[in-house]
Each structure stands twice: as structure tokens, then as C-alpha cells.
């Protein structure tokens, strides 16, 4: 499974580790992803999504029904 938030589309980005002597080596910054179950009242079932912390805040703000509609409009099967 790829490390991509299903709500925001956040994915890993690359950057540098910087030591005290300012020597740089490549590294990845991973999004803060979690598997989370959301109750969908309209479908009378749970939906399991891989979401970032920001994705959870968006769901709290907009509601799971509207967020699911957006995800499905993008062609993702949920």
C-alpha cells in the first residue's frame, strides 16, 4: 500500500538530513498516516480510510459524506 492520504493526497517528499557539520544526506519526509474507521450513516456501515491528521480534521469539518463523495468523484474505489 502506498503512503498517500486518501483525503488530501499528501505523499512522501524528499529532503536532506543536515548534521551539525552541515553535511547533507538524502532522506524522505513521510506523511502522518493512520488507518481509521469512519461510520457512514447514509450507507449504515464503516468505511476504512488511510488518512493524515489533516485529512481527519477535514472530515471533522466537512463531514464524512461530502468527503466520500469527493473521493469517489476522483475515481477511487471506497
UniProtKB/Swiss-Prot annotation:
Q: Which UniProt keywords apply?
A: Ribonucleoprotein, Ribosomal protein
Give a yes or no for keyword Ribosomal protein in this entry: yes
| Record bears the keyword Ribosomal protein | yes
Q: Where is this region: Disordered?
A: 1-23
- Which Gene Ontology terms cover its molecular function? structural constituent of ribosome
CC per GO annotation:
cytosolic large ribosomal subunit
Q: Which domain of life is it from?
A: Bacteria
Q: Might you name a Gene Ontology BP term for this protein?
A: translation
Name the PANTHER family on file.
Answer: 39S RIBOSOMAL PROTEIN L28, MITOCHONDRIAL (PTHR13528), LARGE RIBOSOMAL SUBUNIT PROTEIN BL28M (PTHR13528:SF2)
Belongs to which family? Belongs to the bacterial ribosomal protein bL28 family.
**Record HAMAP family:** Ribosomal_bL28
- What is the name of this protein? Large ribosomal subunit protein bL28
| Naturally occurring in which organism (per UniProt) | Marinomonas sp. (strain MWYL1)
Amino acid at each position: 500500500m502506498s503512503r498517500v492520504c486518501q483525503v488530501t493526497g499528501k505523499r512522501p517528499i524528499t529532503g536532506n538530513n543536515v548534521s551539525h557539520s552541515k553535511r547533507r544526506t538524502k532522506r524522505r519526509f513521510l506523511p502522518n498516516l493512520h488507518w481509521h474507521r469512519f461510520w457512514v450513516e447514509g450507507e449504515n456501515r464503516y468505511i476504512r480510510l488511510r488518512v493524515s491528521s489533516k485529512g481527519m480534521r477535514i472530515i471533522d469539518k466537512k463531514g464524512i459524506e461530502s468527503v466520500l463523495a469527493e473521493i469517489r468523484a476522483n475515481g477511487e474505489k471506497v
